[in-house]
């Protein structure tokens, strides 16, 4: 199961175009996307970036580029703790950013320091989906070291449950992505973000 390929503003109704206009005018903060692998963070980040002309930082991609190796290779050579430290340092660096969509790796929100850094200049949005949906989205992807030899619903469900409390504690907003296309997910997210931002003023 994949997200609907349609991810541009073309063909949207007037209400959606008005929503996009209002959000462009009001958004002066970062949007930090967290959640389990396959929840839709990268797809949503690309769509939001396109709609609102916001910068996008894919943390895993940037870390991989800077280290000159893939995420599985970083885990293999240096271990998970080394990788988690790279995540923390990058989040600290991103404090200088504004109007940026930050797509975090699946484990980034497991560290309380990371969550603190995320919240300093933005809203944290948790994207979530059922274990079966996650498996369908990641089963052809071998760039997931924590799922190596464990691509099954039972293992994914166990790992998601272990992370659930910290994910939910970190999140300012939770968006379910099952059975929704990317436009529906993004519309729900920005509508709720605008409501939250208006209350925080």
Please provide the spans of the model-predicted regions:
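ATP-dependent small-molecule kinase phosphotransfer cores
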Residues: 58-108, 112-119, 143-145, 157
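Hydrophobic anchor at the beta1->P-loop junction of P-loop NTPases
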Residues: 33
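Walker A/P-loop
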Residues: 42
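ATP-binding Walker
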Residues: 39
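NTP-dependent small-molecule kinase module
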Residues: 13-26, 47, 51, 161-201
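A glycine- and Lys/Arg-enriched "phosphate-lid" helix/loop adjacent to the NTP-binding pocket
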Residues: 120-164
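P-loop (Walker A) phosphate-binding loop of NTP-binding proteins
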Residues: 36
């Amino acid at each position: 199961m994949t997200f609907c390929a349609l991810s541009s503003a073309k063909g949207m109704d007037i209400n959606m175009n008005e929503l996009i206009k209002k959000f462009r005018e009001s958004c002066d903060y970062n949007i930090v996307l967290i959640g389990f692998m396959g929840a839709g963070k990268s797809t949503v980040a690309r769509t939001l970036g396109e709609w609102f002309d916001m910068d996008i930082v894919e943390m895993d991609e940037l870390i991989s580029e800077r280290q000159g190796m893939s995420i599985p290779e970083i885990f293999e050579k240096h271990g998970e703790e080394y990788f988690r430290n790279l995540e923390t340092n990058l989040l600290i660096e991103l404090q200088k950013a504004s109007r940026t969509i930050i797509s975090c790796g699946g484990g980034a929100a497991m560290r309380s320091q990371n969550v603190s850094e995320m919240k300093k200049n933005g809203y944290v949005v948790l994207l979530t989906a059922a274990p079966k949906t996650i498996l369908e989205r990641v089963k052809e992807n071998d760039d997931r070291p924590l799922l190596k030899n464990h691509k099954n619903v039972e293992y994914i469900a166990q790992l998601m449950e272990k992370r659930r409390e910290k994910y939910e504690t970190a999140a300012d907003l939770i968006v379910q992505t099952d059975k929704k296309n990317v436009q529906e997910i993004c519309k729900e997210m920005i509508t709720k973000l605008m409501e939250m931002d208006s209350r925080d003023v």
